[in-house]
Amino acid sequence: MRMYLVGSHATGKTTLCRYISRRYGLPMITEMARAVLAEMEASFDALRTDMDLVSEYQAQVFARQVAVEKMHRGHFVSDRAFDNLAYAAEHTTIAADLMASPRFAEYMKWVSDGLVFFLRPHPSLLRDDGVRAGVSWESVLRIDGMIKLMLEQHRISYLPVESVSMQERVRAAEFVLARCGVEARPKQPIDGENGHDAARTLAREFMTALGN
């Protein structure tokens, strides 16, 4: 089973993805952007002003996403899919070339056969993580709109997730996965020292990753 959480930056995708991965024992594919940025030994500030560099960066991020998914043989949860192409449209001049490629068409069909959750933005989730484009409400809305356009253009069925409540997001994911016959791992006890440690760990992860 392939499960995707798509949406703009600062919508809580990674937080929910991490929970689903742990709860259902699914391999987690997290965003390729940070890894590619580190490999290129580049900074986000450099990407802002170097068009060739940012074009290479976005092309590599998309290629890496496709390659890593194939390595997992179609069994994973990912905190994004084609999302970076919205950023390519926002910051580069190669978006048309990327979207005209056979690989893009094949990938969108591949995504359409998975479970797609579309996490919508909310001002309360804005947080600057020092990696992605300036975390402004206007930027978030532009990326959100482009991702929705691509979902609709390619007839990809998706579940919109409007709530910012982690509990409600978890319930939405659990409902869909249960209807798909995916069983969760047994829950850890919440009483006792181990239970408190697990609760503290989850709370800490939620607070640190909420903006992803």
For each feature predicted by the language model, list its residue ranges:
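Pre-Walker A (Motif I) flank of P-loop NTPase domains
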Residues: 1-2
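Hydrophobic anchor at the beta1->P-loop junction of P-loop NTPases
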Residues: 5
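The conserved Walker
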Residues: 9
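Conserved lysine of the Walker
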Residues: 13
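Conserved substrate/cofactor phosphate-moiety recognition/catalytic segment
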Residues: 18, 22-66
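Glycine-rich phosphate-binding loop used to anchor ATP phosphates in small-molecule kinases
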Residues: 56-111, 126
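A glycine- and Lys/Arg-enriched "phosphate-lid" helix/loop adjacent to the NTP-binding pocket
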Residues: 93-165, 170, 190
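C-terminal accessory "lid"/substrate-recognition subdomains
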Residues: 156-160, 167, 171-212
